[in-house]
Curated annotation (Swiss-Prot):
Keywords, sorted A to Z: Membrane, mRNA transport, Nuclear pore complex, Nucleus, Phosphoprotein, Protein transport, Translocation, Transport
Pfam families per record: Nic96
Gene name for this UniProt entry: NUP93
Main location: nucleus
Annotated localization: Nucleus membrane; Nucleus, Nuclear pore complex; Nucleus envelope
Lineage: Eukaryota, Metazoa, Chordata, Craniata, Vertebrata
Entry similarity comment: Belongs to the nucleoporin interacting component (NIC) family.
Protein name according to UniProt: Nuclear pore complex protein Nup93
Amino acid sequence: MDTEGFGELLQQAEQLAAETEGISELPHVERNLQEIQQAGERLCSRTLTRTSQETADVKASVLLGSRGLDISHISQRLESLSAATTFEPLEPVKDTDIQGFLKNEKDNALLSAIEESRKRTFGMAEEYHRESMLVEWEQVKQRILHTLLASGEDALDFTQESEPSYISDVGPPGRSSLDNIEMAYARQIYIYNEKIVNGHLQPNLVDLCASVAELDDKSISDMWTMVKQMTDVLLTPATDALKNRSSVEVRMEFVRQALAYLEQSYKNYTLVTVFGNLHQAQLGGVPGTYQLVRSFLNIKLPAPLPGLQDGEVEGHPVWALIYYCMRCGDLLAASQVVNRAQHQLGEFKTWFQEYMNSKDRRLSPATENKLRLHYRRALRNNTDPYKRAVYCIIGRCDVTDNQSEVADKTEDYLWLKLNQVCFDDDGTSSPQDRLTLSQFQKQLLEDYGESHFTVNQQPFLYFQVLFLTAQFEAAIAFLFRMERLRCHAVHVALVLFELKLLLKSSGQSAQLLSHEPGDPPCMRRLNFVRLLMLYTRKFESTDPREALQYFYFLRDEKDSQGENMFLRCVSELVIESREFDMILGKLENDGSRKPGVIDKFTSDTKPIINKVASVAENKGLFEEAAKLYDLAKNADKVLELMNKLLSPVVPQISAPQSNKERLKNMALSIAERYRAQGISANKFVDSTFYLLLDLITFFDEYHSGHIDRAFDIIERLKLVPLNQESVEERVAAFRNFSDEIRHNLSEVLLATMNILFTQFKRLKGTSPSSSSRPQRVIEDRDSQLRSQACTLITFAGMIPYRTSGDTNARLVQMEVLMN
């Protein structure tokens, strides 16, 4: 049987093959075993895929069917959904179809409004995002700029170089971040501000700061002497610093003050030298500069130098005596030498008398030209360096010659060049006979620069060079870069700022030292606000009182947004240090405010406190912000923030020292005080606050197991309906509740349903024989509880608020258990 079947099958196969070969014009292809296997596997996998899909559909139907879902019904509903009515274009209508035309116009208007609203919403979102990014980027830029103390390449120079100590060692470690010198400066700033705040005459800040130098070394003392000398100039009142600093009169005064300082310093140096070598100096005669210089030359020039001309006076070269008398700032003593040697000096006596008697130490143009002509013809290559130097000073000529044989020290070079500086342009001077202050400033700051003066070994020398040439901002910025000298630089800047001599940057994003368009070429500006904030950053967290004293100098400064810098710095200081009570004051139990440190600086503290509170609120410090708004008597903001704080903790279980317990006590204290003092806020915010407090009481009773008391509270609050007649009313009232109340609705519903369920179980657990109430009363109560549970389910389904699926499931479950 089987053999016949296989034989028949073979016969049919051969017949089929023969027919195929007969009708096909294509060449015959024979598959090997491997190809046959691959083809079979492909057919098998195709069959399995179809089978597995059917199996998956069956499994899905079984799974969803066990949960009461009909998968075929769901598929039909999904297939029946159509987006044609929403997204397909409107069908064209005939011109005479008025109804169709109106319908299309209405639909077009709706679609246009939706599209316009969508575009506007996206545009607003983009704009808000862009503004937020710009604000954040501005803050990042400020932080980056504040970390860079200097401009240019120096800001990125991280090489470690040893610095000599110019201040006393830091005292024993303590709470303060200030060392003894910085603390001494801070005390002087406190004294200065106290006088200003109390309306007294403005004290001399230079003298106050200079008194700190007594605790330090001679370099600091000399620095403050120089600052005092250079700032003792007469300024035009009611003009800005740039106009004052640019005026010829003030610039001439700066040069005069610098010369006076250099001359007095050199005279002190000669005194020290002479009294240190009394035997060699042979000091005697009438006390005065002439005898001092004569004795000084006994030490400096013990033997006559070759090339000196025009004889001697009392054994010393004439021109050396004249030069050193002038170097000490005593023209009368120099005139005494000139008179003694007048026969050897020719016309020089006449020229010197005119120079000495002129107001600005300046010869008349005719005399000056005559002297310069004589210098070029006879003295340019003279072998007496002192004679050449004196002629160059009096005639202000040959400014390219540095007179290095005589002016071998930096101070001597400065004195010589400042004597040659001219301010009037008569047009007759050649370039080699003309040196302006701007040219000299540029030469020192840009051409020579820091590398020429070995600033790491002698920082005060370069500071002196810049300061004496009226480049105050560059001098301060240079000194500020050195950690050990930073405090001195800051207080020099404060002195200049108070005297209206400091050129400040117009924007806070500028570098510490910058040049602004429109300023004279050699004018630099200092970012004073940034300088002060960088300095106070070191100690503002540990010494907020001292930092506040420095911030008071910024009371008239504005930032790029027009915000008062004092307010801004105080707010950042309070947030950073968390010294709210000490700085801003404290609220007593009776509602009165205990003054803080800020009260010394202003009688109206509300703007400052409100500003700090606003910053705290923006940083998410709602609890601190609420306390600050309370301090500023801003009841609306207090309750608004308290509502935000209370809402998340309302349903939590109270525990000692918990977050909820702390906030609850704070809220109760505010509520008691507001009610006692009759303080009220916005009605909506006010009602939300007291409702949240009532809900906290409700949940406390509920968690404590006092379900009857909790039920009485929720019944009095009328937040949820407990009978079918009040459902509509409660749903309508729910629309008026704030989000802080709505967010707690799920927990309120669950707690209320739990209370009803507990009462129901308690009622069911009471046997008729043991109960003192009649059976009828028990049945009525049973019916009432079921009705109330049903009412809660109805209310939960009707309110326009999406509760969680878990909440709905639990509510339904308990309601079902009660039925």
